[in-house]
């Protein structure tokens, strides 16, 4: 796969969690969606492939879903990790989304709690969308982040990755 990570913060970088939280809260979803859409166009141009996938973690998982709604012409598969669209003014209309969804969520998560992830799965399936949500027992938010040993779960991360690769091959290989 070819990967591209758009700079949604336009050059602002931090390793401090509090500062990162401030950046996240100030992010304009509409602008971020336009930036991601431009990244999709660039991937399509560079690879010559008409279909792309999106992966996002935490807020990025919600943004990956927003991108799939905004770009049904190109986003064929989306894999949010513990991400939901948590912005009241950004409630998506999933009816237009064509992407298959494979979500990966933690059992113990205040941001994307299991009821929210199950509600997302039900909402998508009610609309006839292909959606599968996995909730990893005993895990916490950010279980895939190996730079955070207090929450990282190697077994759950490996299991999630082993699910994502065939999922992307199924939906992105032409």
PLM region spans:
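N-terminal cap/leader regions of alpha/beta-hydrolase-fold enzymes
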Residues: 1-174
């Amino acid at each position: 796969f070819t990967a591209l990570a758009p700079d949604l913060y336009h050059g602002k970088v931090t390793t401090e969690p509090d500062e990162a939280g401030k950046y996240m809260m100030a992010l304009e979803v509409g602008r971020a969606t336009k930036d991601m859409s431009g990244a999709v166009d660039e991937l399509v141009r560079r690879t010559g492939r008409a279909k792309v996938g999106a992966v996002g973690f935490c807020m990025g998982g919600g943004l990956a879903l927003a991108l799939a709604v905004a770009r049904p012409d190109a986003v064929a598969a989306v894999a949010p990790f513990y991400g939901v669209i948590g912005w009241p003014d950004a409630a998506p209309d999933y009816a237009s989304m064509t992407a298959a969804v494979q979500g990966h969520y933690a059992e113990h998560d205040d941001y994307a709690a299991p009821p929210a992830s199950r509600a997302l799965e039900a909402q998508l399936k009610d609309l006839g969308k292909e959606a599968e949500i996995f909730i990893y027992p005993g895990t916490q938010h950010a279980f895939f982040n190996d730079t955070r040993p207090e929450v990282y779960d190697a077994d759950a991360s490996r299991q999630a990755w082993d699910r994502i690769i065939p999922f992307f091959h199924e939906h992105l290989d032409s």
